[in-house]
């Protein structure tokens, strides 16, 4: 799988900004079919950094309920928390 298809978009929130400063981790929304090895290779190829570890979180899709009735579905997604090697940083996330 091509690394441009694996990394969908960066995840920028208060939580990810806090963990970036605390523990050199950055977060991405990734393709649900990608595994940890593919995610690691994609980040290393896209940003030219060394990756120490990758943790993934899967959120399954669920029904959207309004007034007791199912009115739609909430899409599921997969997040990857990537820990960078000591001394590495991604310039894209700096200043956020």
Curated annotation (Swiss-Prot):
Keyword check for rRNA-binding: yes
InterPro entries: Nucleotide-bd_a/b_plait_sf, Ribosomal_uL23-like, Ribosomal_uL23/eL15/eS24_sf, Ribosomal_uL23_CS
Coiled-coil segments on the chain, per record: none
Claim: Ribonucleoprotein is one of the keywords in the record: yes
GO molecular function, one term: structural constituent of ribosome
Entry keyword set: Ribonucleoprotein, Ribosomal protein, RNA-binding, rRNA-binding
GO biological process: translation
Domain of life: Bacteria
Function: One of the early assembly proteins it binds 23S rRNA. One of the proteins that surrounds the polypeptide exit tunnel on the outside of the ribosome. Forms the main docking site for trigger factor binding to the ribosome.
Protein name: Large ribosomal subunit protein uL23
Species per Swiss-Prot/TrEMBL record: Nitratidesulfovibrio vulgaris (strain ATCC 29579 / DSM 644 / CCUG 34227 / NCIMB 8303 / VKM B-1760 / Hildenborough)
Gene: rplW
